[in-house]
């Protein structure tokens, strides 16, 4: 039996008959007039029986007393045998009772057609189906460096807390939730990170915060807020930073980590969110000024304390004209009776008078990440800001807040 998968060539034959004939007449003429013509090895019936020649496809039509059309014969013979078979078909001079003229139009190499289809399909697969595996030398170097950094993770204290290699030597530390957070920050060259490993704050953490400038860097979910609440009660925290909404610290990219740490805020700006009375905070934490020191120790170099102190001094003196952090905006807005809507990059997208903030939030032309407003925020205004999808509100004060939404962060400006 002939298999179409073995086809090598397809013979195209044109047929013209001087009269009306039908398909059985054409097939009969082909077998009858070629029988015994080429010997036993190339007999058409034997070739079909052994599966070396396929079925004879006759496509004809009659018009005005004449019949014309095409005959298609597929073969798995070699080139020479196929040529001989095709030539033998041109000897047919009668179909039924009619004079006929038969000629070979072409012999199509099916394998060439298959190759063309393969090439076209390969092009599609190359463009659409392959993952982007482009090798970038910078990415390779980063991967190797990240591996080295991760291998340097160690432990500190009796509790064996996961920590970066520079925690004990650095003037500033970052406190995160777990080991995965330490590893992620270590990948990006931040080596002064230590994990609390749960809500029971270890003694080693408390002792470190008393000696070093400390930034608390937690997930912006309920768990992160609970850890921060306990940490504020037992430890000496200077700055607070939260991961973006919907992301944990361990999943953040390098750009997101650096941006979040750069936009950290002093603990005084967030303590009212967790404590109704600042007396709940330990010692004089509620009233002491925040120490100015680097939030992260990248590449083992912690000599950025002076630079940050100068930067913050310029902000306090009013010599920095373009605020770049949330703290800058809070200091800049204070006492000016204005409201600023900020995007994720801390860029002002809308500014209005503080008493017109309700109208301004309804006419924003682009999404805002938060608002800094020099006025007291009540429950009605807060609900409207939450409905607009804001992530944080920094205000002069908060009054009458009975229902505090979990998906927005409230920060009170220091007086």
UniProtKB/Swiss-Prot annotation:
Protein name stated in the entry: DNA primase DnaG
InterPro entries according to UniProt: DnaG_primase, Primase_DnaG_arc, TOPRIM_DnaG/twinkle, TOPRIM_dom
Chain residue ranges for the region called Disordered: 280-323
Naturally occurring in which organism (per UniProt): Methanoregula boonei (strain DSM 21154 / JCM 14090 / 6A8)
Catalytic activity: ssDNA + n NTP = ssDNA/pppN(pN)n-1 hybrid + (n-1) diphosphate
Cofactor binding note of this UniProt entry: Binds two Mg(2+) per subunit.
E.C. number: 2.7.7.101
Binding-site list for Mg(2+) 1: 177, 219
Biased composition (Polar residues): 301-311
Boundaries of every Toprim domain copy: 171-250
Job description of the protein: RNA polymerase that catalyzes the synthesis of short RNA molecules used as primers for DNA polymerase during DNA replication.
Gene3D superfamilies per record: 3.40.1360.10
UniProt KW keywords: DNA replication, DNA-directed RNA polymerase, Magnesium, Metal-binding, Nucleotidyltransferase, Primosome, Transcription, Transferase
Cofactors (names): Mg(2+)
CDD domains the record matches: TOPRIM_primases (cd01029)
Family label: Belongs to the archaeal DnaG primase family.
């Amino acid at each position: 039996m002939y298999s179409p998968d073995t086809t090598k060539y397809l013979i195209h034959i044109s047929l013209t008959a001087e009269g009306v004939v039908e398909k059985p007449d054409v097939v009969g003429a082909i077998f009858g007039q070629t029988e015994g013509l080429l010997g036993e090895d190339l007999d058409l019936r034997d070739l079909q029986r052994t599966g070396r020649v396929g079925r004879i496809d006759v496509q004809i039509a009659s018009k005005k007393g004449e019949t014309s059309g095409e005959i298609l014969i597929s073969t798995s013979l070699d080139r020479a045998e196929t040529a001989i078979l095709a030539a033998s078909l041109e000897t047919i001079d009668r179909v039924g009772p009619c004079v006929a003229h038969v000629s070979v139009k072409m012999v199509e190499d099916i394998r060439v057609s298959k190759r063309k289809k393969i090439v076209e399909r390969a092009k599609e697969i190359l463009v659409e189906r392959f993952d982007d595996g482009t090798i970038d030398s910078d990415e390779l170097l980063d991967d190797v460096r990240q591996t080295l950094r991760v291998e340097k993770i160690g432990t500190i204290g009796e509790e064996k807390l996961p920590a970066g290699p520079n925690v004990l030597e650095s003037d500033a530390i970052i406190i995160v939730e777990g080991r995965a957070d330490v590893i992620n920050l270590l990948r990006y060259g931040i080596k002064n990170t230590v994990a609390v490993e749960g809500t029971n704050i270890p003694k080693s953490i408390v002792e470190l915060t008393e000696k070093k400038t400390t930034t608390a860097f937690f997930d912006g979910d309920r768990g992160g807020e609970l850890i921060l609440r306990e940490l504020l009660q037992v430890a000496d925290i200077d700055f607070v930073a939260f991961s973006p909404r919907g992301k944990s610290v361990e999943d953040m990219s390098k750009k997101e980590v650096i941006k979040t740490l750069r936009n950290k805020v002093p603990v005084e700006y967030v303590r009212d969110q967790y404590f109704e009375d600042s007396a709940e905070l330990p010692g004089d934490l509620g009233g002491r000024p925040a120490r100015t020191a680097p939030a992260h120790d990248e590449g083992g170099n912690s000599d950025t304390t002076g630079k940050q102190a100068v930067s913050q001094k310029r902000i306090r003196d009013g010599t920095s004209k373009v605020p770049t952090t949330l703290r800058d905006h809070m200091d800049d807005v204070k006492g000016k009776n204005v409201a600023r809507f900020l995007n994720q990059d801390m860029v002002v997208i809308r500014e209005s008078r503080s008493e017109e903030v309700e109208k301004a939030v309804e006419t924003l032309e682009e999404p805002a990440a938060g608002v800094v407003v020099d006025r007291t925020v009540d429950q009605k205004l807060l609900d409207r800001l939450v409905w607009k999808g804001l992530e944080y509100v920094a205000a002069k004060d908060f009054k009458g807040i009975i229902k505090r939404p979990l998906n927005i962060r409230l920060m009170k400006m220091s007086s």
